[in-house]
Curated annotation (Swiss-Prot):
Signal peptide: 1-27
GO CC, alphabetical: encapsulin nanocompartment
Cofactor info, note text: Binds 8 heme groups per subunit.
Family matches, as Gene3D superfamilies: Cupredoxins - blue copper proteins, Hydroxylamine Oxidoreductase, Chain A, domain 1, Hydroxylamine Oxidoreductase, Chain A, domain 2
Catalytic activity: hydroxylamine + 4 Fe(III)-[cytochrome c] + H2O = 4 Fe(II)-[cytochrome c] + nitrite + 5 H(+); nitric oxide + Fe(III)-[cytochrome c] + H2O = Fe(II)-[cytochrome c] + nitrite + 2 H(+)
Protein name as catalogued: Probable nitrite reductase-hydroxylamine oxidoreductase fusion protein
Lineage of the organism: Bacteria, Pseudomonadati, Planctomycetota, Candidatus Brocadiia, Candidatus Brocadiales
PANTHER family: MULTI-COPPER OXIDASE, MULTICOPPER OXIDASE
Amino acid sequence: MLNKSAALVPVVLAFLFLFLCFQCLYADIRCLTGKDGAVHLEMEAKPLTIEPRPGVFFDAWGYCLKGDVPTVPGPVIKVREGTKVKILFRNKLTVPASIHPHGVKYTTANVGVNIAGNPASIVAPGDSRIFEWDTAGTPGTWFYHSYVFERGGEEGLSRGLWGALIVEPVGGDPNPPDKEFVVFMHAFNVNGQEYYAFNNKSGDIELMRGDSSAFPGETWKAKMGDKVRFHLINITEEAHTFHTHGHRWLDKSCDKLIDTIGLNPFDSYVLDFVAGEGVGKGNWAFHCQSQEHMMNGMFGIFMVEEGKRVNAVIASCDEGRKTLSAPGQDRQPPTLEGFSGAYMYPEITEKNMYESFAGLEKGDGIWGDYYSPIPLYTYFNPSRHYVPPESDAYTNLLVKYRPDQCVECHEETTPGIVAEWKMSNHANPKKNPHVSAETQEIEALIGKELNNWRPGTKDGVYCSYCHGSDHEKLFMPTVDNSCGACHPKQAAEFIKGRDHGRPNHPQSWEGNVSTPWYAEYYRRGEGYSMVGCDQCHQNMSSCDDCHSRHRFSAAEARRPEACSICHMGPDHPDWESYSRSKWGVIYETTKERWNWDKNLAEVIPGEDYLAPTCQYCHMYVGNNKWEMNVETKGIWRMGVIPPKEVEFKSGLKDFPYGIKIPPMDKKLEIYSAESQEKRRKWVELCSKCHSSRFAGMWLDSLDQYMFESWRRIDEAQLIIEKLFSENAIEPPPEKRPPFPLSDLIIKVLGAEKLGAEMYRLFKQTNGHLPVIGPILGAYSIFTQNEGNPGGIEREYAEMWFWSHLQGYKGAAHAQPDISWWWGTAQGVGNLTRIRDEAEKLRRLKSGSSSGF
């Protein structure tokens, strides 16, 4: 029988599969060009947990761009010499913090240290301020860090509050590298043991003793012949060295070839060499020469691979390339002919799994190589699967119509979509002054004039703008291949939903296909059973999920019904709870009087809208601003992640059981600094109609409702855990079918992604292990296979996945019937049945009938 840790696998694996984000660890460092000689950044300091070595966890603090997940090291800031850097810094820690730069120029008001007699320049918890630096005459590799000596802030350096600051010479880089890496030298103290590290990874010395399964520490990859640059920064109070196996470089200070360099505390150094030059491909160890430091983890592996060298694209500020690190910088206006966006999947690994064309030969995501999709994938995820139709009818129509007569031809073949398009702003981009003003902005962006369509013309946003002009190479419009060219602001705002963690709209398809039971259905020949999931979770790179084809109406997308097709049902009854709340009743009885043509930021509550809508509330980002995403203020998220504020007695108390995969690598913290900021924005929004006192009470009431519901879930989880430990559930895990996709879980994810303990359990049991509780225990609702899961497990899944979430939505949206009868009452009933069933199972186990 499995031990208790095995019984807790469900919660651990939940976040592993549904929220795993594959990222490349080596740096693609882009130069920030900014505007008018200045780069404007918004940065934050937040807590996080890092895993320097598998199974070793460190409570860190990290910097990040606004809304991003914090990292150690923080974001690389690379600018051209002479650029002004202005950073709006928000401190989301519980201790003071700052940003202090090395090397560049700044005033005493921007030093980031609380020196007596100078203006205060550290930032209290929850506060913000602007730091300004001048890089004129200061080229080089520097770094920035927190510089606080009071109220706990002095731990900033040891906790990870540092990042690289690179100033490129004013004349540019005459020999730019193909690959560029930043390496911080540091040590993390965990329970009294020092784990020496490059960046945030500490290698296992067993790798140096021939154990290929040992953790390699930090890894860097390059192709044979790549010009490689390493920026070394010693962020500790100890001296370190950096030694490269097989590679050497010219040290400019002595004009000699060397392969080892020493760095004093808080020193930096830059080295350049050619990958594999004279030594070939392979895995090369780079390490600190100090035996103690290397033995305790300060090494990494430089992987040189065969392959064609890619010319340098990363070092020069002259290129003006778009960078994700400076949202406000200029970029060249896209044109519809040449636009190739990178909003949805900027990372090459994600592109390969979700966007690179595969037709209908293979699926999507981490399991994509192991199933072939149903034909409807051509519409569910068109950027990867769309196949133009092959039909003799098209050939016959060409006799009657020219290839560019899209409207005339489709008026005969699909008149409905043409009629929709003719009513749209796409066909009538200058139908009134308001639309004309927006059209003028788009015309300037794309370099084309857009006039109202007239019969016989190709005016307006014609079919070819969104589908291409070649019918043989027809494509479906997505954010990346068309929408983002004319609507880059909306596209960028929409994609920001990813920054707040899953679930979110941009990654809805990823969440769908990454669940193990999804691909398992396909392997059983039952892929069509997942169509219900596919229709809501279809790739939202297509804007028509909210703006229906072919009107693409903003007014339609502002109405709450636009959300109802997906946001309904037992696990998220948003529509049921909103439409039957007092808000929904007011909306239903007065909606024809509302002004749907106004942008949300222009709406006057009580005049244009007589009650709130989904969009008005959830797209609000604070300070009287609305954006094209709904994730900004999510505190409880979907509602299935255990909160830190509840003292759990079941295995939920140990969540997340050592698995540390951002962003879902910890319990929710309902009263963290970040959550308090979200709460402030909610109260700010609600105060447009209610008193701030009432709004605060309502949010507090929702929190307490959820805490009480989680305590009932905790009791149910504990009951089932004990049943498994008592071997009272039949058939036991080892005698029933394994967890879905168990044979691939080990193969595809491996020890590095599963974690050492989970990897061992799956390998030891071949997937014959109990999986219960949030969130992978939801497989109980999606599948049933010869006793796996059992009835009591199904009952528990319905408790936390249906009853709990129904109550959550009812309480949040002020619908009393759903809050109580669909939520609390149902959850209590689930718990009662679980208690009764547990007693029956124990009696069966003991062989007693006890009156039955």
